[in-house]
Swiss-Prot record:
The gene is murA. Its EC number is 2.5.1.7. Cell wall formation. Adds enolpyruvyl to UDP-N-acetylglucosamine. This is UDP-N-acetylglucosamine 1-carboxyvinyltransferase. GO terms for cellular component: cytoplasm. It comes from Azotobacter vinelandii (strain DJ / ATCC BAA-1303). Keywords: Cell cycle, Cell division, Cell shape, Cell wall biogenesis/degradation, Cytoplasm, Peptidoglycan synthesis, Pyruvate, Transferase. It is found in: Cytoplasm. Transmembrane segments: none annotated. UDP-N-acetyl-alpha-D-glucosamine binds at R93, R122, P123, V124, D125, L126, D308, V330. NCBIfam families: murA, PRK09369.1. InterPro entries: Enolpyruvate_Tfrase_dom (IPR001986), Enolpyruvate_Tfrase_sf (IPR036968), MurA_subfamily (IPR050068), RNA3'P_cycl/enolpyr_Trfase_a/b (IPR013792), UDP_GlcNAc_COvinyl_MurA (IPR005750). The keyword Cell wall biogenesis/degradation applies. Gene3D superfamilies: Enolpyruvate transferase domain (3.65.10.10).
């Protein structure tokens, strides 16, 4: 199993490009199943979850054509089976996203209950109830979700999400695109990745209004055609490198990103003392060698502060001036990295859904273990600011969400290398 070794104490300085967003790419890949002609998806990140999704399609008979830049042409007309098997689904929660498109396009689907990061209870109930609102008949059997559309196909309906769900909104929006009649989704997720999926569907001929608000209206169409689409930049990868620069008192410029989808994070980084400049597709940040100031954050669904950034801010606060609190309202069990960071000399107290972080002058390198995707990133940041060497084990979590993380950090001057397992 690969490990990362980081020699801390070096300010980040330089420029890198940001990859396509995994959390936009996965639903967009799933949505290619809705098209009856080939679709090309560009700007895909080189990540394990992406290759797993492409492998899943291959197992189902869809033969992807991949070029050297990881643009993928998908043609769902060659599909041979409507079963998403457990051995692929178990490693990736997002595979649930094929349920809605398969059901809408082919009238049936069989998808194993998903895996992915073990963060709290992430139920699939909303997906099931939402699809039932469109007329689907669904049963759970042997660890599989087995779904059938009624005779004549799915029909438009009204569905209220009692909990905001990004993948739930995406799954039902995709299914509704080919349902007959109008579907109204209330308390829908507003994340930019949902908007990116809607724009992709609209490009194929779907009729969707309100994406990015809490009410999405879909007028079903009879068919969706192919096309070419470039996935949006990854806002969480963007935020992670910005926080790493702040924690190391450095200076970076990030290209091929979008500052408008990261406003809550940028405001907090300015509060921490960063000087930030932005353009249409770039962000520059300069700490001018200063120690960051501790900030308070509270996670909530978009457009508020993202849960996927709280672990990184805990790392920044750990070496900041003062005390900052981080309140997690989206997922439970999302402070598992704190105990590893305390072993590095951090002063972090967890009380329920709140982490109270008192900054220390510096952390000490230590062997640590990654527990989930974003926690892994926080340990990398901790390693960058620590004295001595930090060895991070179980970095397959990092590889699920960050493309070439050690190479990008090396471009910024970090002393980091991968040790093959």
């Amino acid at each position: 199993m690969d490990k990362l070794i980081i020699t801390g104490g070096h300010r980040l300085d330089g420029e890198i490009r940001i990859s396509g967003a995994k959390n936009a790419a996965l639903p967009i890949l799933a949505a290619t199943l809705l098209a009856d002609t080939p679709v090309t998806v560009c700007n895909l990140p080189h990540l394990h979850d992406i290759t797993t999704m492409i492998e899943l399609f291959g197992r189902m008979g869809v033969q992807p054509v991949i070029d050297e830049k990881l643009s993928v042409e998908m043609d769902a007309s060659s599909i041979k089976t409507l079963v998403a098997p457990y051995e692929l689904v178990k490693t990736m929660r997002a595979s649930i996203l094929v349920l809605g498109p398969m059901l809408a396009r082919f009238g049936e689907a069989e998808v194993a209950l998903p895996g992915g990061c073990a963060i709290g209870s992430r139920p699939v109930d909303l997906h099931i109830r939402g699809l039932e609102a469109l007329g689907a008949q669904i049963e759970m059997d042997g660890g599989y979700i087995k779904a059938r559309a009624p005779a004549g196909g799915l029909r438009g309906g009204h569905f209220f999400f009692d909990i905001v769900s990004v993948t739930g909104t995406e799954n039902i929006m995709m299914a509704a695109a080919l349902a007959s009649g109008r579907t109204v989704l209330e308390n829908a997720a507003r994340e930019p990745e949902v908007v990116d999926l809607a724009n992709f569907l609209i490009g194929m001929g779907a009729q969707i209004k309100g994406a990015g608000t809490d009410t999405v209206v879909i007028e079903g169409v009879k068919r969706l055609g192919g096309g070419r689409y470039s996935v949006m930049p990854d806002r969480i990868e963007t935020g992670t490198y910005l926080v790493a620069a702040v924690a190391t008192r450095g200076r970076v410029k990030l290209k091929d990103t979008d500052p408008t989808i990261l406003e809550a994070v940028l405001l907090k980084l300015e509060e921490a003392g960063a000087q930030i400049d932005t353009g249409n597709n770039w962000i520059s940040l300069d700490m001018k060698g200063n120690r960051p100031k501790a900030v308070n954050v509270r996670t909530a669904p978009y457009p508020a502060f993202p849960t996927d950034m709280q672990a990184q801010f805990i790392s920044m606060n750990a070496v900041a001036e003062g005390t900052g609190t981080v309140i997690e309202t989206v997922f439970e069990n999302r402070f598992m990295h704190v105990y590893e960071m305390n072993r590095m000399g951090a002063r972090i107290l967890v009380e329920g859904n709140t982490a109270i972080v008192t900054g220390v002058p510096c952390l000490k390198g230590a062997p640590v273990m990654a527990t989930d995707l974003r926690a892994s990133a926080s340990l990398v940041i901790a390693g960058l600011v620590a004295e001595g060497d930090t060895l991070i084990d179980r970095i397959y979590h990092i590889d699920r969400g960050y493309e070439c993380i050690e190479e990008k950090l090396q471009l910024l001057g970090a002393k980091i290398r991968r040790i093959p397992g």
